[in-house]
């Protein structure tokens, strides 16, 4: 998925956006 796509795998989202935890988009 693209950056910000909540359906993308958590790690992929965080890596995409340059964060180190999955809290980058949603707080779990």
Curated annotation (Swiss-Prot):
Principal localisation: secreted
As recorded in UniProt, coiled-coil segments are none
* Top-level taxon of the source organism: Eukaryota
The protein's GO terms of the molecular function aspect are: sodium channel regulator activity; toxin activity
What keywords is this UniProt entry annotated with? Disulfide bond, Ion channel impairing toxin, Ionotropic glutamate receptor inhibitor, Neurotoxin, Postsynaptic neurotoxin, Secreted, Toxin, Voltage-gated sodium channel impairing toxin
Q: Name one GO cellular component term.
A: host cell postsynaptic membrane
Q: Spell out the disulfide connections.
A: 3-17, 10-22
Note whether Repeat occurs among the keywords. no
Which tissues is it found in, per the record?
A: Expressed by the venom gland.
Record's subcellular location? Secreted
Family per similarity comment: Belongs to the neurotoxin 03 (Tx2) family. 05 subfamily.
- Chain's role: Insecticidal neurotoxin that reversibly inhibits the N-methyl-D-aspartate (NMDA)-subtype of ionotropic glutamate receptor (GRIN) and inhibits inactivation of insect sodium channels (Nav). In vivo, is highly toxic to insects.
Q: What is this protein called?
A: U15-ctenitoxin-Co1a
